[in-house]
Amino acid sequence: SSSYLALHRGIPAERAAELSFVPYRPRWPEDLDPKASVIEQVRRRDQLLFFPFDGVDPFLQLLREAAERPDVMSIKITIYRLATASKVAHILCKAADNGKEVTVLMELRARFDEENNISWSRLLEDSGCRVIYGVEDYKCHSKICLITMRRGDRLSYITQIGTGNYNERTNEQYTDLSLMTAREDIGLDGAAFFQNMLVGNL
């Protein structure tokens, strides 16, 4: 709220640090090998991240791999709030530059983040991403990322569904869950979700 922001701005930085908890350092999940492909590990077994105790790095690594792998056809993602220096956005730009079809459903009416989201939308579009803005009179709070791959003559999916924004800063502050899965039924649900959002079918 505006009263909270006014109070927060009125506290000197050094005093704010004294009043805050010691920052928690997120860990890399024990059952994920940091030296192996995250995509291949998710294909073998679902992975559930619990922020802020688990770090966001496994999801970022998943996106980086998707941006580079030749079998990845597309990345679709919903965005409500991004960090000011967003790693997610830069990876999406890299993916588009590598010829992937990148679709971003951007919510421009995220409270207090409107200007930041407009700036990121322009950068994403300039990088070749397809940016859509949802449906009039509705906000999109969904947090979902769908990676579509072609394996032989079949499509397969890696889907990430979570409760938290794709914001590396707040992922270290708020309690959220993030599921990464290769389940086909969830991937098909994700594909249907994005298709319906593209045509405004709610």
In which residue ranges do the predicted regions lie?
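N-terminal localization/anchoring segments of enzymes in phospholipid and broader phosphate metabolism
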Residues: 1-202
